[in-house]
Amino acid sequence: MSDHLEPVILRADNFTPPARTPWGGRRIVSHHKAGIDPARFGVVGEAWEFSLDAAFPSRVASPDWHRDARLADVIAAEPRSWIGRDDGHISLLLKLIDAGDQLSVQVHPSDSYAALEPGTCGKPEAWLVVAHEPGAGIWLGLADDISREDVEAALDAGADLAPCLNFVPVAVGDAFVIAPGTVHAIGAGVTVVEPQLVHPDRSGVTYRFWDWGRRYGPSGVLDVAGTPRALHREHALAVTGWDGLRGQAFVESRRYHPVVIEERAELLHQLVLDLGPVSVERLSGRGYFDIKTKSTLTVIYVLAGGLTFGAARRVERGGTVVVPAIFGTLAATLDADTDLLVLYDGPQGI
């Protein structure tokens, strides 16, 4: 195996600016990133923890010969060895999202939506709740007996859209699959890990129904004299799934229940999300563990604690390791009280 095909550790500061995510909070830098000084940052709504997107590309922290290189360029040099397949397709985009205020009420189209612009695609995603304030929650799907006409009437009146939706109080560990056509919003005080599925060289599309009547200044700060964010009423109405379940029945249909893979005295291994092309496993506890690539690109994201691998290479809270498919097995030692996610991009990871 050539030297450059060892796992790479990514820079942990791939943050969006406040103007892009004006609803952001401060927990990402204060609670979820070891070794980053919160005083250097203000509001941070998103950290793109694994990204090949040119807008916010992941960059390498180590090894030294790849330092600050774009991860996309590193993979492109030997795609078969990194990805484990010949198609060169990586669908995963991984974000950590912290909502200081509620996000807009929105919906994503499917890839089959005829009005998608060139260079864009649908954006199936999922949420794994990692922190929340007391009583905080999400909005997910349409409430009982709500019709398209009800939503249109609320929009016409400039009324609060929340009564048309299901508010779901959350707990740490809750997981939800957000399929195309699902109306949704993350509520204030909720922090989630969000894996998304996007096409290479395309941007996932979000259509906003409503943004809670907010206006913003140029820097992304709330300003009653400012400008509202763009809404996409007609597209949002067109792609919403109006048929099917409502209310609590819909919420439960979107909830993903973890499956225990292995349980040791000091370590729990679970499958916590399955999005088809991408699956997400969780390791919680301490001790030695062989993380297998399953012949596909593998992403390890540390939620808490830390791990050591190789020649004393360390990854701590908020850090990401990307393991090439060809690597086979990463022998890792987890610190006490470590919590990490292992994400597989490809059919072998399911």
Where are the language model's segments positioned?
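Transition-metal
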Residues: M1-S147, D211-R254, V280, Q348
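Short histidine-centered beta-strand/loop micro-motifs
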Residues: R85-D86, K95, L116-G119, Y288-K294, ...
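His/acidic/aromatic-lined binding-pocket segments of jelly-roll/cupin-type domains
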Residues: L94, L103, E125-L128, F167-V168, ...
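Ligand-binding loop in jelly-roll beta-barrel domains
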Residues: D98-Q102, D111, C121, H132-G135, ...
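Intrinsically disordered, low-complexity linker/loop segments enriched in Gly/Pro
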Residues: D111, A131-A179
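Loop-centered beta-sheet repeat module
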Residues: D156-R214
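Short acidic-glycine-tyrosine-enriched beta hairpin
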Residues: L165-V177, G310-L330
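Acidic/His-leaning functional-site neighborhoods
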Residues: F250-G319, I326-F327
